[in-house]
Amino acid sequence: MSDYTNVKELFGCDVFNDSVMQERLPKKVYKELKKTIEEGKELSMEIADVVAHEMKEWAIEKGATHYSHWFQPLTGVTAEKHDAFITAPMDNGKVLLSFSGKELIKGEPDASSFPSGGLRATFEARGYTTWDCTSPAFVRHDAAGGTLCIPTAFCSYTGEALDQKTPLLRSMEAVNKQALRLIRLFGNTTSKKVTPSVGAEQEYFLIDKEKWLQRKDLTYTGRTLFGAMPPKGQEMDDHYLGTIRQRVSAYMKEVNEECWKLGITAKTQHNEVAPAQHELAPIYAPANIAADHNQMTMRILKKVASRHGMRCLLHEKPFAGVNGSGKHNNWSLTTDDGINLLEPGKTPHENIQFLLVLTCILKAVDTHADLLRESAADVGNDYRLGGNEAPPSVISVFLGEQLEDVLEQLISTGVATHSKKGSKLQTGVKTLPDFMKDATDRNRTSPFAFTGNKFEFRMVGSRDSISECNVVLNTIAAQAFKEACDRLEAAPDFALAVHDLIKEYATDHQRIVFNGNGYAPEWAEEAARRGLPNLSSMVDAIPALTTEKAVKLFEEFHVFTRAELQSRAEIQYEIYAKAINIEAKTMLDITTKQIIPAVIKYTTVLAQSVNAVRAAANVDVSVQIDLLEKCSDLLAKTKKAMDVLAEADAHIADYPEGRERAVYCREEVVKAMDNLRKPVDHLEMLVDKDMWPMPSYGDLIFEV
């Protein structure tokens, strides 16, 4: 690989994007396909056949031998089935290469083999994948060769969504319709579409692959279940934005190139706070494309790490005692002609459309804080949220001094007359230029922060799909916009009505705004006084999916049916219980086969040392005896805690699948796991390093 990368030539070279379609498709076909992409017009089979043929020819030129409907079931990862382009051999023994419009538009994977939460029985196997033409197809190269990947939605035989993409597309249509109504009220007759724009900042850890293989907890669960803190962690703040090590730099270079080939706008890369932790952030894209790109990015991060002798960890909390990993979801609403509805301008107090959009979103987040919290619910996130590293589990909105002041003016006097300006920053060094500061600071502790012209939702877990949180954001915004438009369209005096509505929403939903320190213990108490929900675990958050409030919301905008919501809740409970069960069994396996034998071996060496030294000379052996007693005591505690965990784990199956089993796992199994970890981590600090059966935290996070 050469040192020089021609990014302009590389970018999108493996994507069947607009420029490729313009070049290869007949004009009529291209225009019809664009109408489908931009306006949702139905695509005829005649047009689909032409598109499929040209897509196949292009893919073959790129080295593809197979095609795949690439979709995102409710497993948390992508799925695909590869079919070759070849047809049955002809009489002369040769084959043709074929790909029809029908094969492009529809596939039939086995729906019974994916999570359905009761929507599909094992014998009800038929499911369909359907081409999402708004997200471009791409060719992916790996050891198997080239594969044409076609982004698709996945639904059951009876039409229920079994994936992440379908509800996301539905929610995008909902917010588009209602946002267009809103901007029409302000005289905008030219914009034809409003699209949620999303940029997902992806955090991850890199560790040496050989050391990863020696940690069964990492290989089975994605996180360390045991591990004592090394003498140094992240307390010196020297890793964040520090110099990137050569091995990691080479890795990042290849990650960027792989992303750029697939049209992923990988933009920013840097070291994160914890040792061995890093971040990759792209430029914004439409929400469905951003979700696809993030799934592709996670795969690239893992694949390239393996090539460089490393392992990429996407778990939210792979190491206790240092920061975990999240995925900040930056969300805004943009028209097809480039207007950002969340752009306040220089004088936000005069920007009435912006203030209406802003207060609608405050209303949406306040009304559906439980749903927004649930959209980030994940078993790994339970170990991350609420620490001094990630947002608290209470949803609140940070607006900053400028916007908070504007709203306070509206609430207290009924009129906003001014907006705070940013002052000039003077460094006191003549050779450094002075410049205007932003009107407000940032707040890294807020779960939902306004950051200039977008909202940044910081709760999402690092390995999770961003689809779910954007489904919620789009749908709750659509509801708030609809309710506002219903009132304003019927108002005799629009100017007066919109002013009153902004004031009403700002007043009624002021409790959701919090500009202080979200890490402070006092905030949890204040949030309780305000009546804000504090859903501290995944199990607490899941019921938000099936409340009558949620059902009414999602059914009104045709995003989910009641049955689909119930199925997703059941899947979430099942995922939680299975994940905890796997972690518990892994702890028991490691303790039985590695920890206890290693400690017995070490205490035997200590005992032999005591006897040998005593036999050789009349000297003090109190150090050896003290160490022997401590290790033996901790070994006994370890065995006792292991037995308690084994008992708790054995009873998991006694509880019905669903909420009861998940609650039991959280209340009993997780507690037993914590109690087993404590003596084992203490033992690690006492036992000879050469006898400890696995790499330490220091080995893992400081040796990449």
Predicted regions and their residues:
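C-terminal amphipathic alpha-helical interaction region
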Residues: 507-704
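Composition- and surface-driven signal marking solvent-exposed, interaction-prone regions
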Residues: 218-219, 294, 316-317, 343-347, ...
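Basic/polar N-terminal segments that are highly enriched at the extreme N-terminus
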Residues: 1-9, 703-704
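Glycine-rich, acidic/polar active-site loops that bind/position phosphate-bearing ligands
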Residues: 125-314, 323-329, 333-570
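Short linear, low-complexity motifs centered on an aromatic residue
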Residues: 76-92, 109-112, 117, 215, ...
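Flexible inter-domain linker/hinge segments
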Residues: 1, 10-18, 177, 181-183
